A protein has these predicted regions:
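N-terminal cap/leader regions of alpha/beta-hydrolase-fold enzymes
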Residues: 1-234
């Protein structure tokens, strides 16, 4: 189990963003910035955060849509998907990268944290994790099915941390050609890993019957925890 709180992170003149914090029972020395999917910081993201906290990590999950839809949460069903896609259309992506980078710095400054936190994101958060890794210095980047990543490979030389990508071979939202481009771009780069599961988009999301693939989720999560354990032990 963990204890939870909500911190406020200054984001320039725009105001303050909520950063939900999970603290493990034992004093943490490593942290993970967990970046939401389009459905918000809802039951699924909170469950992932708790899983990471049980593993010993301090976890922070920023409220990415705070500038126009604070505390956004949507159902993990077709109606929620449609509503969430509308919210994504309102997102100022560069501003969101700045906000998440500020959250990373805040998490890095918490007591006991010895080195830079990891960034771990799902869907929209997978794209943001990659962008933040290119603009800041996290210890590790784990990106789950970030649909924007194939179009952002030009920033790969800016990413200096070990990076693990997860995609599904049957993802209707991300072309296999884009995933292949990632594989080609990271070939020969130490610490960069591409994992492709036989699954569709958002396969880790246990809250969504239309997306979840239990076998793929378990396999990818085992790889994620091994990757974190190698480069950022709790």
């Amino acid at each position: 189990m963990s204890t939870t709180r909500t911190d406020r992170v200054a984001c320039g003149n725009a105001g303050d963003m909520d950063l939900h914090i999970w603290t493990p029972d034992q004093r943490p020395k490593a942290a993970v910035l967990l970046i939401q999917e389009i459905f918000g910081v809802g039951p699924y993201i909170r469950a992932v955060a708790e899983r990471l906290a049980v593993a010993g990590y301090l976890v922070g999950a920023p409220d990415v849509f705070w500038r126009f839809a604070p505390h956004w949460e949507a159902g993990h069903d077709p109606a929620g998907l449609g509503a969430s896609m509308e919210k994504v259309g309102q997102l100022d992506f560069p501003a969101a990268v700045g906000d998440v980078t500020a959250a990373l710095a805040h998490l890095a400054g918490q007591p006991g944290i010895e080195i830079a936190p990891a960034v771990l994101g799902f869907c929209l958060g997978g794209t943001l994790a990659w962008a933040v890794a290119a603009n800041a210095e996290p210890s590790v980047c784990v990106s789950y099915y970030g649909s924007g990543v194939p179009d952002m490979l030009g920033m790969i030389d800016q990413v200096t941390c070990p990076t693990l990508f997860h995609f599904g071979s049957e993802d209707a939202f991300i072309a296999n050609a884009g995933v292949d481009a990632i594989g080609a771009a990271i070939a020969g780069r130490e610490g960069f890993v591409l994992n492709v599961e036989q699954a569709g988009h958002a396969f880790d999301n246990h809250e969504s019957a239309m997306f979840h693939n239990e076998a793929a989720a378990k396999a990818a999560w085992a790889k994620t925890m091994a990757f974190l354990g190698l480069y950022l032990p709790a």
